[in-house]
A protein has these predicted regions:
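Short beta-strand-centered segment that lines the nucleotide-binding/catalytic pocket of NTP-utilizing
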Residues: 251-270
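Switch II (G3) loop of P-loop NTPases
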Residues: 291, 309-327
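Glycine-rich phosphate-binding P-loop
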Residues: 228-247
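Conserved NTP-binding/hydrolysis module of P-loop NTPases
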Residues: 271-291
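Long, low-complexity, Lys/Arg-enriched
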Residues: 1-52, 58, 63-163, 176-226
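Short hydrophobic/aromatic beta-strand immediately N-terminal to the Walker A/P-loop
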Residues: 54, 167, 228-231
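Conserved catalytic-core segment of NTP-binding enzymes
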Residues: 322-402
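P-loop (Walker A) phosphate-binding loop of NTP-binding proteins
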Residues: 58, 171, 233
Length: 418
């Protein structure tokens, strides 16, 4: 069975607009897909001409970037990508004079965007791949709180050479990646870089020898940075801590802090941001349930490779470690260098210390005894930070400053420049 199934479904929006949702379904139990799966897409039903298309589903950005150009031959008046954080669809391509890129298709109770829209920065530079070829990179720098209105006047840099292939690079919303792919589609090929793959994936273009849809090219990477595993028993606040650490570290270090969510819960950045809005919490839980995966033999192998690749292209990697310690997890464990534990149960800590220290050889940075109370009590600072802290609730991006500071102190000691 193909790993990616596509189904066009008629849909009527809250204001009566007739559209079609192109639903992206990942058919694998673990919800993992590989670039070569783009070569075996299965269309259960295809888009109908004359009706706008909304790309909808949970998939890597390179899947969305590949699907938008594939919809063009169906003569649809516009293409949009579903943005769960707005509960709306963002127009990324249109032939309708009444619409333009960046406009929103309201799906009912859409969420207001920031009133001021800051421009995205695009920078052209060559990068080397492991096959010794130099590729043209279009780096994307997205300001915090970016508005979809940036698409209205978005153009490619004048020094971008469309007689060469283009690699899109950087952390950006799916709608921005998809729009840039469409703008650059007249190049011989367009690729989107994926940090966990340490590769770029061919998603569009006019075809070129040796570069077809779904091909992946590994780029030259640097020395491996530290990777901090964040572990502990269920219902202790592990994912809340991981997200808060990522937010705090990115604000201090910059965007080259990578979060690898090595669990099957179906939560991503989108879930955390949606759950922070009370109006989107129910929808967030629906999408989380739909994206929830099952653990398979390749699950931890996949995430182990992703952590190793991310370590070679980041300044620091955080690993939100799902489940409980078992033999299958050791491969992923050995890709990490340090660990932080958070637990609401003291009796669970010895098992986790044994797993991380004795089996993984990792260095402990901190132990947090989580509580539902608003509390911060430092128990010790050496040989690792130990504290009682809380509460840890979804939808909040704040945590005790000491927890951020200990990571910063150790990161500095490990040679990570700030």
């Amino acid at each position: 069975m193909p790993a990616i199934e596509l189904t066009s479904i008629p849909y009527t929006t809250a204001n009566g607009l007739q559209v079609q949702r192109l639903v992206i379904a990942l058919t694998t139990l673990d919800k993992l897909v590989n670039p070569e799966d783009l070569k075996r897409l299965e269309w259960k039903s295809r888009p109908q001409p004359g009706i706008g298309v909304i790309l909808d589903g949970r998939a890597p950005n390179w899947v969305f970037a590949a699907l938008a150009p594939l919809c063009l031959p169906f003569n649809v008046p516009w293409i949009a990508t579903y943005e769960p954080r707005l509960h709306a669809a963002v127009i990324v391509h249109c032939n309708d004079p009444g619409l333009q890129p960046g406009d929103l298709v309201d799906l009912g109770k859409s969420i207001p965007q920031p009133s001021e829209s800051r421009e995205c920065l695009l920078n052209v530079k060559d990068v080397a791949a492991r096959n010794s070829v130099h590729y043209q990179r279009l780096a994307i720098f997205v300001p915090e709180g970016v508005n979809t209105a940036v698409l209205k006047d978005l153009t490619l840099p004048l020094n971008l050479d469309l007689t060469r292939g283009v690699v899109l690079w950087g952390k950006a919303p799916v709608w921005l990646y998809t729009r840039l792919t469409l703008l650059a589609r007249n190049a011989p090929w367009v690729g989107t870089y994926n940090k966990p793959l340490a590769s770029f994936v061919i998603v569009a273009g006019q075809s070129a020898p040796g570069a077809s849809l779904g091909d992946a090219f590994h780029l030259v990477t640097g020395p491996a940075c530290p990777a901090i595993l964040i572990g502990g028993p269920p219902n202790s606040g592990k994912s809340v801590l991981a997200n808060a650490l990522a937010i705090g570290l990115k604000r201090k270090f910059g965007p080259e802090i990578h979060m690898q969510r090595a669990h099957a819960d179906g939560e991503g950045d989108w879930f955390v941001q949606m759950y922070a809005n009370v109006d989107l919490q129910a929808r967030a839980m629906e999408l989380r349930h739909a994206a929830k995966a099952k653990y398979t033999d390749r699950f931890f192998l996949h995430h182990a490779a992703a952590v190793q690749n991310a370590r070679e292209t980041s300044r620091l990697v955080l690993v939100d470690f799902g489940g409980v310690p078992n033999n299958e997890d050791v491969t992923l464990l050995h890709r990490c260098t340090h660990y932080i534990l958070i637990s609401s149960r003291d009796d669970a800590l010895p098992e986790w210390h044994n797993f991380c220290t004795n089996r993984g050889g990792l260095q402990c940075l901190a132990v947090i005894h989580s509580t539902l109370d608003a509390k911060l009590e430092i128990l010790q600072r050496t040989p690792y930070l130990e504290l009682i802290a809380g509460p840890w609730h979804r939808g909040e991006d704040k945590l005790p400053n000491e927890s951020i500071e200990v990571v910063i102190e150790h990161a500095s000691a490990l040679g990570i420049s700030v």
